[in-house]
Amino acid sequence: MSANLKYLSLGILVFQTTSLVLTMRYSRTLKEEGPRYLSSTAVVVAELLKIMACILLVYKDSKCSLRALNRILHDEILNKPMETLKLAIPSGIYTLQNNLLYVALSNLDAATYQVTYQLKILTTALFSVSMLSKKLGVYQWLSLVILMTGVAFVQWPSDSQELNSKELSAGSQFVGLMAVLTACFSSGFAGVYFEKILKETKQSVWIRNIQLGFFGSIFGLMGVYVYDGELVSKNGFFQGYNRLTWIVVVLQALGGLVIAAVIKYADNILKGFATSLSIILSTLISYFWLQDFVPTSVFFLGAILVITATFLYGYDPKPAGNPTKA
């Protein structure tokens, strides 16, 4: 049963990651009549959906009892204001990160984005060393060097980029790259900060996600007011929303829940395998379906290095199955 859950969670992760990147990219480049949907509002809606999903999961864990659900939410959130406030910092950073991903995929093709975004492995590792005093092995340090080399190859200018010059200017690609790099740093810091909180307390990951979603909604609404307030007052909060937009929002809302399931049922090596599959699928679909990406030999070399680094970082050279003596 656990093996089935392991591969099911990884399969869902591949589907969710690939689908989110491709649909978000397509939705931001699709030319339609009327105003385009506002990414700031999509981030808020995704946070609200995540809260609803987590409440349902807590309800399930409390044996489908509304009374038990109400008691848990009251005891774990309202009665522990300081514990809840701890999530304000990572929540604000995650909200910034989610907005940056929309900026990145508005300016970069899905394949380039997918590979470059794996730099979050590097930032997560560095923040883990500094904040959690985590020690990295030789294989992990080597994988980080390979990762940086691979991403550098992926971002290496090539003649094939001239084919996309009508769609993407050098300026917009620079904006996309800066958005991805900033998202990598924010993802690394927020992820390690969240891990530190989870390890220091006994609250469930679903309660913590509800707290994250609560602050995320507040920060997201502040972003809507500051950056898109005029457009919202003119055309409405849900301007430009269509079926594709809702698919993007739902996929983004499910992202954190899928990661939680993978952490629970799988391991780093299989998670790396899922990430690698997602990169390959994104590359193929970007080339054959979206037709906004022409892979080069340099890109393939970089992608192979990134995939290798992903596996190597999760590799444990210690033999498994030897029980420790008491």
From Swiss-Prot:
<dbReference type="GO" id="GO:0015297">
    <property type="term" value="F:antiporter activity"/>
</dbReference>
<dbReference type="GO" id="GO:0005459">
    <property type="term" value="F:UDP-galactose transmembrane transporter activity"/>
</dbReference>
<comment type="function">
    <text>Transports diphosphate-N-acetylglucosamine (UDP-GlcNAc) from the cytosol into the lumen of the Golgi apparatus, functioning as an antiporter that exchanges UDP-N-acetyl-alpha-D-glucosamine for UMP. May supply UDP-GlcNAc as substrate for Golgi-resident glycosyltransferases that generate highly branched, multiantennary complex N-glycans and keratan sulfate. However, the exact role of SLC35A3 still needs to be elucidated, it could be a member of a catalytically more efficient multiprotein complex rather than function independently as a single transporter.</text>
</comment>
<feature type="transmembrane region" description="Helical">
    <location>
        <begin position="4"/>
        <end position="24"/>
    </location>
</feature>
<keyword id="KW-0812">Transmembrane</keyword>
<keyword id="KW-0050">Antiport</keyword>
<keyword id="KW-0472">Membrane</keyword>
<comment type="similarity">
    <text>Belongs to the nucleotide-sugar transporter family. SLC35A subfamily.</text>
</comment>
<feature type="transmembrane region" description="Helical">
    <location>
        <begin position="136"/>
        <end position="156"/>
    </location>
</feature>
<keyword id="KW-0762">Sugar transport</keyword>
<keyword id="KW-1133">Transmembrane helix</keyword>
<keyword id="KW-0813">Transport</keyword>
<dbReference type="Pfam" id="PF04142">
    <property type="entry name" value="Nuc_sug_transp"/>
</dbReference>
<comment type="subunit">
    <text>Interacts with SLC35A2; the interaction is reduced in the presence of SLC35A4. Found in a complex with SLC35A2 and SLC35A4. Interacts with MGAT4B.</text>
</comment>
<feature type="transmembrane region" description="Helical">
    <location>
        <begin position="269"/>
        <end position="289"/>
    </location>
</feature>
<feature type="transmembrane region" description="Helical">
    <location>
        <begin position="212"/>
        <end position="232"/>
    </location>
</feature>
<dbReference type="GO" id="GO:0000139">
    <property type="term" value="C:Golgi membrane"/>
</dbReference>
<dbReference type="GO" id="GO:0055085">
    <property type="term" value="P:transmembrane transport"/>
</dbReference>
<keyword id="KW-0225">Disease variant</keyword>
<dbReference type="GO" id="GO:1990569">
    <property type="term" value="P:UDP-N-acetylglucosamine transmembrane transport"/>
</dbReference>
<feature type="transmembrane region" description="Helical">
    <location>
        <begin position="293"/>
        <end position="313"/>
    </location>
</feature>
<feature type="transmembrane region" description="Helical">
    <location>
        <begin position="38"/>
        <end position="58"/>
    </location>
</feature>
<dbReference type="InterPro" id="IPR007271">
    <property type="entry name" value="Nuc_sug_transpt"/>
</dbReference>
<protein>
    <recommendedName>
        <fullName>UDP-N-acetylglucosamine transporter</fullName>
    </recommendedName>
</protein>
<feature type="transmembrane region" description="Helical">
    <location>
        <begin position="174"/>
        <end position="194"/>
    </location>
</feature>
<feature type="transmembrane region" description="Helical">
    <location>
        <begin position="244"/>
        <end position="264"/>
    </location>
</feature>
<keyword id="KW-0333">Golgi apparatus</keyword>
